[in-house]
Amino acid sequence: TSDRRYRFNYHAVNALLARVYSYAGDSTNAIASAEEVIKKSGLELSSNNQDDPILFSECICALYKHHLTEALSQFWADGDKYTTQYFIRSERFNKYFEVSGNLKEDMRTKTAAFYEHSSTKTALSRKYSINSQEAIPLIRLPEMYYILAENTSDLTKAAKYLNAVRNKRGYSRSVNVQFTNAATQQAALDKEFRKEFYAEGQYWYFLKRHGITALSYDNAVTLTQERFEFPLPDAEKEYGWTASHDATR
């Protein structure tokens, strides 16, 4: 409801369970939890991101950040000649979001979602520059569909869950994806995770849990183990940590 805002409630618990069960390889419980959220949370997939590029209308729970816009403006809005902002080069943008020429069916690539700077050939996400909620999504509804798409053994049915999100985002049914095997299933999920959760962090976890070492849109990047491990804080080293602990991680 509107009263709860984006606090961690019953539906958020089920959404988190769906995520954890999926991570653990427990498809039965992952499916049950994801279906519970889709059927009973009252949220629906959106086909319009105008004035809501991060799609709070689909947000199950979020982390509040006081004065978020001001705190992040140098990265997502203001800045001196693109020296501080987290922009993406147009060439990589087109590969990342599968944009061909001027063809932009996907609303996640349009001007409501990205500001494109033609002279520098860069694009900048609007997710944190247009953010009246001052919140960072932790779990959004599309992830529940992706969990169903990943954990449903019937590949035809699994593809329908992925296409449900794609169709809402602007893709016509004529370009619906199909899964012929586990490899094509994962490849399609890879593409949708990176498009849907750009600048939200979820794609990093997708890459990590699937052990993906190469990016399909950037051959120059190799995902080594170091890219998936956060540096140990110095404070933890002061309280008994030794190098031998690495062997148990």
Language-model-detected regions and their locations in the chain:
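Acidic/polar-rich alpha-helix caps and helix-coil junctions
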Residues: T1-E91, E98-R249
